Amino acid sequence: MKKIVIFSSFFLIIFTSNSFSKIEIKKVKKHNIELIKFQSPDRRFPGKDDVIAQIHFPKNINGKLPVIIWQHGSSRDGLRFKKWGGKTDEMGKRIARKGVEQGYAVVLLDSFYKKGIQPSNKKKFPNAIKSAIVLKNILSKDLRFDNKRFFYAGFSFGGGQALKLYSPIFASRTKSPWKALVAAEPGCNTVQYPAKLTIKGLIIKGEKSHYYLPACIYYHKLLQKVGNDVELVTIPKVNHFFSLNGTIGTGAAVNGCTHNIALRYPDGSFKFADGTPTTRQEIIKKCITNESGVGKTREKLDEAVDLTINFFNKHNR
């Protein structure tokens, strides 16, 4: 039997003091899904301001919903959106399924939308945290959502974006603070120097990842040193994709600064962990390697998903 999916749509125009943002929303009947298209300019992609997200709603809604915004990794290999051609990764697909079961609205953000980005284009990735903040500020005005219970999570590249919330540069761009964040398998080789913030955090790492543990161990200690409440959990015997069949392969990865990570400071300067000043160009040269991870059987991915949702449940109050 052929399935017919019906869409309804409407437009919003949001004005600020010197600009406007056209927001288009499409509702997918019978799927408890909405899609939103909005603008988040990135200087790396002039004229390609559109970003989209797919919002998954619980079947039964009682009161205002807590919201998880999910940022995909470099490979959007898990789920194609119902409209507009957006995609997310496999962990995002499972987070959406588990999250709505637990009563969350789960927002799958596609920050690569129509930008022609391939997983190997590490130097061209957008500053996706900006899109997440724009989206949060939009959704915070929607009366269906509890603007005091917004959570941010991501995998790999997305996990690195989530950790940027500990930078004072990005933390100050939302009217109400994020409740908590989860960074699943971030690289931690190039990070923001953190400030002390109220956001609760969890870093999940595979012990056999090609994004080797020492980098995230160092950054976790730094986050705690400045006063943040952040946990680090490792899953034994699994690689970057939470698989048990992991090996080291060939492909671009930001893992060349494992033992001396690069930090960006609030004033825009860069230093390595040992205090040596550096530049963006040197960081790119030293930190990007051709040593990637292989193996996507994902036997332990559901464990990482459960860790994520359980952590948010703990702080969902």
Residue map of PLM features:
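Short beta-strand/loop motif that positions the catalytic acidic residue
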Residues: 197, 203-205
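C-terminal catalytic histidine-bearing segment of alpha/beta-hydrolase fold enzymes
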Residues: 229-317
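Alpha/beta-hydrolase fold nucleophile elbow
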Residues: 144-156
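Alpha/beta-hydrolase active-site loop
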Residues: 91, 95, 121-143, 164
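Short glycine-enriched nucleophile-adjacent loop
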Residues: 159-172
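A conserved short beta-strand
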Residues: 172-187
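Short substrate-entry loop that stabilizes the transition state in hydrolases
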Residues: 61-65, 70-117, 209-213
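N-terminal cap/lid segment of alpha/beta-hydrolase-fold proteins
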Residues: 23-63
